[in-house]
Every structure is written in structure tokens, then in C-alpha cells.
Amino acid sequence: LWLLAAFVLCYAVMALLSIIIDRLETPEGSDSRNKRLLIFVFVLLLLAWTPYLLSFYPGSVQGDSFWSIEQMIEVGHPNNNHHPVAYTLFLGIFLKIGELFSDYNIGICCYSVAQSALMALVICRAVGFLRENGAHRVYIAATIAFYALEPLFASYAIALWKDPLYSA
């Protein structure tokens, strides 16, 4: 019974996305052909991933991330490239934001939101690629639903870890 309910729900989501994609389409010669669709996908992904961020506030801090955090907040902690320097410095920007509020959790949450936005932009580009190459709207809707509803992407989007940004 639950499998039937899941099937009906997935069908309804894909049908709804297909209708929305039809309404967002613009004339063939328009420069903004994909713009509204991509904005919709971006907002949809962030909304779909928000419950994960709220559940794991300030984000899902992985064990490896503590080394990068220590490199940024401890004076005299030796820097090394076991965790990429670019990632550590990027994370450091958000830790400094947290310092402004005297709460590193705020900085980590800002990092999680920024990483989620970057990953959503990458996925938007993938959806745009499908659209530009003439993929049928059902495939586009299935792709959007997959990225929005598959928990792995939401979990990865809020993970304070070096891998999500490099794999995006």
C-alpha cells in the first residue's frame, strides 16, 4: 500500500512539474528561454533542502571538517594541504562571519546555505543543459524531482566537508 502511495505521489509531483515547465517556457527565439525555469528550479531545490538544514542546524559538520575549522580559528595551528587550502580559506570566511556574531554556528549555517546555493546552481545548469538540448519536459520534470526529493543531495548540500564543493 505504501508503495502505491509513493508511486501516486511521484506521479503527481512529476505531472505538476511538467505543467509548471510548460507555463515557464518562453518563445523559441527569446534570450530568457530558460531563465524562469532555472529560477524556479533554484528556488524549488533550496525549499526542498531547507528541512534538512533546519534538522541539522547549523549544518552537518563531518569529522574531517574539524581540522579545517581548527586551522582557521586556532592561532599557531599548522596549515597543511591534507584538507585543501582553498576549501579551508573559503570556510574561514564564514567562520569570520560567525565571529562577528560571537557564534560560530551562525558562520557554519551561512556556509551551509552558501554551499546549498552553489550546488543548486550547478543542478540548475544541468537542467538548463537538458532543456537546451531538447529533452522532453517529462525527463526534465523527473530530473528536477530527483534532485529535490532524493535525500542524498540535500544531505550533501548541507555537509560541512570538502567533498560537496569539489564534486559539484
Per-range role (PLM):
Residues 11-12, 110-134:
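Transmembrane-helix motifs of polytopic, lipid-linked glycan transferases
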Residues 155-165:
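Short acidic/glycine- and proline-prone juxtamembrane loop motifs at membrane-interface regions
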Residues 56-70, 77-94, 102-106:
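Extracytoplasmic catalytic/substrate-binding loops of multi-pass membrane glycan-assembly enzymes
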Residues 1-51:
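Start-transfer (signal-anchor) and selected internal transmembrane alpha helices
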Residues 46, 109, 113-117, 141-149:
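Residue-level signature of the transmembrane alpha-helical core
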Residues 13-17, 21, 90, 94, ...:
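Alpha-helical membrane-inserting segments
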Residues 35-40, 126-149, 167:
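Transmembrane-helix signature of polytopic, membrane-embedded enzymes
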